[in-house]
């Protein structure tokens, strides 16, 4: 099938690769090059880099609405999107004979929006998945063609689920396109009453609230790793928490109070009498290290000190 692909981040690359292997990719539409890193060097998106390896034409409109005719000039039979990053106008959605379909990293109608992987982990979900659906003018609200569930374990974080879901997305997309060509698949409308949302992560969501139970904070740490990384304050300075674990035990201390410092990490009082052990942390301006390495010299993690003081 002749396809135009629209995507931007690393999540989209395995999906693009699969389309290149199995179909004719006429063009790729991706976000413009953006400044990256301390030197703010203009950097192409991962999707653009992959397309250029294969000599595929690349379009990078600042506003797709102002350049949609250039996309339609390729006369695709199908448009596939995966984490593109802009709302696709109706003129584009309606043009291809087979429509415009999207690869979304959740089991719709749950977790519509830009951060479905983060939010599913933060919420403590035991599974999420991939949905292939028709694009609609309303965000992630189109009729669903196919879905596949993927388990979330306590060992998973955003990176591991990102990689699993991207691979599943490529497989499911391939099967879905075959079914579209054969006319053996029907789209099912989403139940709007069951829709939930996962908008892009906001800065305030990065802050660990020690009033919450340890399990919720454990999920938050995983759901913020490797980006943007959850944090707390110690003596007014940020302490990023890369890894933590819920441990057995009870306490009657104030939430955020350091209960113990051991070779295993820093034990912190949480809500409902629960305890979270910080095992990998990153002080401001330094690299992430095992928590016990910070305890070997002078450190601010005295038993009884409260973390998080200074947050508004």
From Swiss-Prot:
Gene3D superfamilies in UniProt: Formyl transferase, C-terminal domain, Formyl transferase, N-terminal domain
Keyword Cytoplasm: no
Keywords carried by this UniProt record: Protein biosynthesis, Transferase
Origin superkingdom: Bacteria
InterPro entries the record matches: Fmt (IPR005794), Formyl_trans_C (IPR005793), Formyl_trans_C_sf (IPR037022), Formyl_transf_N (IPR002376), Formyl_transf_N_sf (IPR036477), Formyl_transferase-like_C_sf (IPR011034), GART_AS (IPR001555), Met-tRNA-FMT_C (IPR044135)
Keyword Cell cycle: no
Cellular component terms (Gene Ontology): cytosol
EC numbers on record: 2.1.2.9
Catalytic reactions of this protein: L-methionyl-tRNA(fMet) + (6R)-10-formyltetrahydrofolate = N-formyl-L-methionyl-tRNA(fMet) + (6S)-5,6,7,8-tetrahydrofolate + H(+)
SUPFAM superfamilies documented for this protein: FMT C-terminal domain-like (SSF50486), Formyltransferase (SSF53328)
Any single Pfam family the record assigns to this protein: Formyl_trans_C
Residues reported in the UniProt entry to bind (6S)-5,6,7,8-tetrahydrofolate: 106-109
Coiled-coil region list: none
GO molecular function: methionyl-tRNA formyltransferase activity
Main EC class the enzyme belongs to: transferase
NCBIfam families the UniProt entry points to: fmt
Main function: Attaches a formyl group to the free amino group of methionyl-tRNA(fMet). The formyl group appears to play a dual role in the initiator identity of N-formylmethionyl-tRNA by promoting its recognition by IF2 and preventing the misappropriation of this tRNA by the elongation apparatus.
Family: Belongs to the Fmt family.
PANTHER family: METHIONYL-TRNA FORMYLTRANSFERASE, METHIONYL-TRNA FORMYLTRANSFERASE, MITOCHONDRIAL
Entry protein name: Methionyl-tRNA formyltransferase
Gene that this polypeptide is encoded by: fmt
